């Protein structure tokens, strides 16, 4: 269970395919670019970190697996089990609901594929990069999960009418209240930053200082990653942190000649590993509750965190080394995205 949780949290945003997180962070990055250079047409795409994240998926799997075998399992010993575990049986109606949800998903994905290959969702000359499909990935995913959930609910009998749907949505959103409130203040913070031009002033001052002291290149990138890791202990939401960081660090790194997609990538590397043990994450308390209910009733939060910390530190070090090797080899991080800005942007 710990390994699965670490893979989902510490390896967060490392995917084989472009995900909603890519679109979310890319939007915040482009907002920072626009605030810094209002007249520019330059922007990053949702695929700006794609190549690196594909490779990172395998890196995270190997590192977390190695840590589990050599560091975590020897400390915990062999789990014998209570022998009283009971699984809820899936009813025939629930099976019908799952079948309906699966068929709905297939039909919807087929429709999206047709719209892409027929033209409306494709980019210029049929390109995938920069296409309306990628720009609209979040609403596309929202509709997918919404119609699948509705199909399952009505066929399985969980939903009788629209009031049941409203109640289910309200129940799920109840736990998101603190996040929505935090996003509100992040939006106000970002708006004030753009209005006062404080982000631009900090970016210019910071870039001049770093250039004068010669603190650029790999040391700068590693320092930025470690800063993101430290802040992640206190603010676990990746989008909330990037909403605060992007207006400052995207322009600052652009003034030093670095591509915004590369800056975003450094942030993502620092944002992920410590997710698996920070007490500020609601998920660690959820996994503790599940572990106490199903496996180890006397498990404490300290034991869980103590086993997560070594794994996160090893992954953070491995990920930084992997990035440095990638930089030295000069491999693109995504389609058309390298370390430095294209000529003529600044």
Residue ranges of predicted features:
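Hydrophobic alpha-helical transmembrane segments of multi-pass integral membrane proteins
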Residues: 1, 180-189, 212-251, 255-256, ...
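Membrane-core helix-loop-helix motifs of multi-pass transport proteins
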Residues: 1-79, 92, 265-268, 284-325, ...
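Transmembrane alpha-helix interface/packing and boundary motifs in multi-pass membrane proteins
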Residues: 11-15, 190-192, 226-239, 268-276
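Interfacial loop-to-helix junctions that mark the boundaries of transmembrane helices
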Residues: 43-55, 92-98, 125-141, 211-215, ...
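Juxtamembrane interface elements at the cytosolic ends of transmembrane helices
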Residues: 63-86, 114-124, 142-162, 288
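Hydrophobic, small-residue-rich membrane helices and short re-entrant helix-turn-helix hairpins
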Residues: 82-99, 124-128, 154-176, 297-306
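Core transmembrane alpha-helical segments of multi-pass membrane transporters/permeases
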Residues: 130-200
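Helix-loop-helix junctions that connect adjacent transmembrane helices in secondary transporters/permeases
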Residues: 194-219, 226
């Amino acid at each position: 269970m710990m390994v699965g949780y670490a893979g989902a949290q510490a390896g967060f945003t490392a995917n084989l395919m472009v995900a909603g997180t890519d679109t979310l962070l890319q939007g915040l990055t482009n907002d920072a670019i626009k605030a810094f250079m209002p007249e520019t047409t330059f922007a990053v795409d949702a695929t700006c970190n794609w190549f690196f994240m594909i490779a990172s998926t395998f890196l995270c799997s190997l590192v977390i697996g190695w840590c589990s075998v050599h560091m975590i399992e020897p400390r915990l010993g062999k789990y014998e089990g209570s022998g009283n575990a009971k699984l809820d049986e899936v009813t025939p109606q629930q099976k019908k609901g799952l079948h309906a949800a699966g068929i709905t998903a297939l039909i919807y994905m087929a429709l999206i594929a047709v719209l892409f290959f027929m033209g409306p969702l494709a980019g210029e000359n049929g390109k995938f990069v920069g296409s309306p499909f990628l720009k609209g990935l979040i609403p596309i995913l929202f509709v997918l999960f919404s119609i699948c959930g509705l199909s399952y609910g009505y066929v399985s009998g969980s939903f009788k009418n629209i009031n049941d749907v409203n109640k289910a949505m309200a129940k799920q959103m109840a736990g998101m209240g603190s996040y929505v409130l935090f996003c509100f203040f992040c939006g106000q913070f970002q708006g004030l930053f753009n209005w006062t031009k404080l982000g631009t002033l900090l970016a210019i001052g910071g870039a001049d200082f770093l250039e004068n002291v010669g603190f650029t290149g790999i040391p700068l990138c590693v320092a930025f990653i470690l800063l993101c890791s430290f802040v992640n202990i206190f603010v676990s939401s990746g989008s909330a942190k990037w909403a605060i960081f992007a207006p400052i660090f995207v322009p600052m790194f652009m003034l030093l000649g670095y591509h915004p997609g590369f800056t975003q990538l450094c942030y993502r590397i620092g944002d992920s590993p410590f997710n698996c043990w920070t007490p500020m994450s609601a998920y660690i308390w959820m996994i503790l509750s599940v572990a106490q209910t199903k496996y180890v009733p006397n498990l404490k939060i300290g034991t869980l965190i103590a086993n997560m910390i070594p794994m996160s530190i090893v992954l953070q070090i491995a990920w930084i080394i992997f990035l440095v090797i990638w930089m030295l080899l000069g491999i693109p991080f995504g389609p058309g995205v390298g370390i430095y800005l294209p000529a003529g942007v600044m």
